[in-house]
Design a protein with these regions (language model features):
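Aromatic-rich peripheral "rim/lid" segments of glycoside hydrolase catalytic domains that contact
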Residues: 1-120
Length: 120
């Protein structure tokens, strides 16, 4: 948002990202022109010219790297199963048994699914 009012920018960024994230057709965010000294609308940037962070960047971090980022530690059942919920996206699962560790990446798509990790 191209305004010198940084609090308004932060509020707008929060509301806009939440609206986008809530829509089923949105699969990601791309931020163009994040640095004030190279932005076509300098007041809209997330970093000032001296690279200090503006409040709208903190909002972005709080949502994208905080509230919307799934982090989970757990212990599987006796059958070796662990049921979890997560946001759509790419994950890395790491499991250890008897001193051996296995990692695997997978994508969690809408509708969920089952991921099987074979342990030695």
């Amino acid at each position: 948002m191209n305004t010198p009012d940084e609090a308004l920018q932060a509020d707008y960024t929060r509301d806009f990202l939440i609206a986008l994230y809530s829509h089923k057709a949105v699969t990601g965010f791309i931020m163009w022109g994040f640095w004030e000294s190279a932005h076509w609308k300098p007041a809209a940037a997330m970093f000032r010219s001296d690279w200090s962070e503006k409040p709208n960047l903190q909002v972005w971090k709080d949502l994208v790297l905080g509230a919307w980022k799934t982090r989970l530690d757990g212990v599987s059942s006796a059958q070796g199963e662990l049921d979890v919920r997560g946001h759509h996206g790419r994950y890395r699962v790491t499991a250890s048994v008897n001193g051996k560790t296995v990692s695997r990446e997978f994508d969690l798509a809408p509708g969920g699914g089952r991921v099987v990790l074979q342990l030695p």
